[in-house]
């Protein structure tokens, strides 16, 4: 491929490092999304506790928050490829022990919660894959590479939940073993990646949060992060509540997985809307539109109209999610120097995850003392209130993309 400047670059499909990272990441994401359905089903089937499913999710996100800044520091100081291999191997090891305990009939709540902590802490190191991809392709191909990542992630999110549901229906141990194998495939392919040596920044111990403060220094990013935190937390909580709601109505596990896959189906379809919407709306206005559009879909999930209707609402909710992810890439990843990019990326993801633990526990308690439908309506109200407050900010409404006046 010849760029407008006359520089010849290797097509992405022939870029060895990119292919290895893309394929390995596809397996890792497929395993993660399969677990998102399988773990709540496992907990509900073993202990019949909706609150415990929320505790599992809350522990996972809490460890992600706590480990975010240290993980970013590690990613900027040490070999990102080796750190990613270590993270994938640790996740596989945790799931193997869980599968063995389940097979032997020795599964305990403490073991499940410990697994949640391992998965959450390694998730922060898993952001290394995003940085490795950017080191594998030239600037001219970065947009195409990011689009390829988005398609891969959404495809995995689409296939993962039904895969988790189907495997769980066959045997509760199968989704754990499948995710283990996929994590190990990812680790093996990542180990084969060969990149030029990167200049390592001798970061001091007091610089752990510098990447985050650099991201927050930008006006649009400060405003966007607040809305992104709300959209992100509501999206994850809504998936969990939907699973509990459908199971309470006797919907089969495999069908629950198909319904929840509607979130990913919408996100995959939403990738075609990224370019046209960004040509017409600034980043702040786009966030507000996405947030407002998701309110009626949350309320719609609360209507007792069956699994087909629920799948349609999940699909509509997911349409706006690619906009959120591309916004992060444009305003954070591309704007921060590589020597601080790990800290900035981990810091922003830490903030996005910050509201999840409280939200997950609150949703679990609300489901215990009321109903999943009430929980969904509460989420819709909170999202509406947050976006409505953000619309009063002129800096959010008039924010523009980098490079535009």
Describe every region a protein language model picked out:
Residues 1-405:
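Alpha-helical transmembrane-bundle signature of multi-pass membrane transport and export proteins
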């Amino acid at each position: 491929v010849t760029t407008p400047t006359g520089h010849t670059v290797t097509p992405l499909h022939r870029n060895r490092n990119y292919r290895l990272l893309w394929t390995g990441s596809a397996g890792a994401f497929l395993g993660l999304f399969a677990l998102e359905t399988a773990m709540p089903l496992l907990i509900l089937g073993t202990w019949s506790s909706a609150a415990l499913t929320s505790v599992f999710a809350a522990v996972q996100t809490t460890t992600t928050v706590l480990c975010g800044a240290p993980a970013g520091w590690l990613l900027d100081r040490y070999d990102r490829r080796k750190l990613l291999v270590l993270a994938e191997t640790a996740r596989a090891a945790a799931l193997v022990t869980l599968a063995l305990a389940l097979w032997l009939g020795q599964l305990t709540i403490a073991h499940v919660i410990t697994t949640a902590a391992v998965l959450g802490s390694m998730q922060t190191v898993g952001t290394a894959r995003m940085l490795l991809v950017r080191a594998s392709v030239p600037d001219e191909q970065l947009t195409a590479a990011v689009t390829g990542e988005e398609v891969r992630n959404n495809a995995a999110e689409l296939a993962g939940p039904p895969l988790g549901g189907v495997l769980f229906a066959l045997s509760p141990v199968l989704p754990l073993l499948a995710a283990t194998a996929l994590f190990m495939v990812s680790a093996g392919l990542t180990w084969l990646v060969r990149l030029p040596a990167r200049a390592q920044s001798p970061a001091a111990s007091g610089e752990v949060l510098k990447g985050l403060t650099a991201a927050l220094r930008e006006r649009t990013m400060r405003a966007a992060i607040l809305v992104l935190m709300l959209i992100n937390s509501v999206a994850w909580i809504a998936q969990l509540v939907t699973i509990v709601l459908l199971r309470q109505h006797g919907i089969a596990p495999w069908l629950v997985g198909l319904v929840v896959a509607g979130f990913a189906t919408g996100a995959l379809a939403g990738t075609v809307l990224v370019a046209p919407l960004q040509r017409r709306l600034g980043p702040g206005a786009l966030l507000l539109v996405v947030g407002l559009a998701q309110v009626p879909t949350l309320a719609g999930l609360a209507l007792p109209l069956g699994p087909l209707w629920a799948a349609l609402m999940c699909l509509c909710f997911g349409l706006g999610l690619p906009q959120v992810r591309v916004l992060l890439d444009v305003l954070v990843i591309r704007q921060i120097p590589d020597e601080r990019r790990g800290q900035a990326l981990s810091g922003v993801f830490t903030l996005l995850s910050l509201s999840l633990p409280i939200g997950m526990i609150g949703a679990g308690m609300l489901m215990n003392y009321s109903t999943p439908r009430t929980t969904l309506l509460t989420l819709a109200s909170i999202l509406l209130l947050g976006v409505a407050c953000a619309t009063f900010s002129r800096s959010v409404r008039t924010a523009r993309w980098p490079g535009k006046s």
